[in-house]
Design a protein with these regions (language model features):
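Acidic, PIN/NYN-like endoribonuclease modules and their adjacent C-terminal/linker elements
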Residues: 2-23, 27-37, 43-46, 65-119
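Acidic beta-strand-to-loop metal/phosphate-binding motif
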Residues: 4-6, 55-61
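Short, structured active-site "lid" loops
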Residues: 43-58
């Protein structure tokens, strides 16, 4: 499983997920590919993640669904999105969020064009 944690996700979640699933590739956008994607628009990040077969982890329900809808209208796929709610997973709950991400990743095999909300 390959994950990209977007800028809204605490960077420490990457290491916490890797402790649970050491065979996965988990990157934070601030350091992924030398940090070049840190300030990139969501549509470009979705393109790059799709090319890399990397699922995006985000709490950004304000703009990301719009980009996904636009991609779909253009016939473009995405590699999947794991959404989470900050009320359920506050920034200080890194371990709890990491466990939920790992659990969702183990339960689901096909991520293409899907999104899952962590509970």
């Amino acid at each position: 499983m390959k994950l990209l944690l977007d800028s809204h996700v605490p960077a420490g979640v990457a290491a916490a997920v890797l402790k649970l699933q050491s065979s996965w590739s988990v990157e934070h956008v601030s350091s992924w590919q030398g940090g070049g994607w840190r300030n990139a628009d969501d549509d470009l990040v979705l393109d790059a993640c799709h090319e890399d077969r990397r699922v995006v982890v985000s709490k950004d329900r304000r703009t990301l669904p719009g980009w996904v809808a636009l991609r779909a209208s253009e016939g473009k796929d995405h590699s999947g999105i794991l959404f989470y709610d900050e009320d359920r997973f506050p920034a200080r709950a890194i371990g709890t969020l990491a466990k939920a991400v790992a659990s969702a990743g183990k339960e689901r095999r096909a991520w293409k064009n899907s999104w899952v909300t962590l509970r």
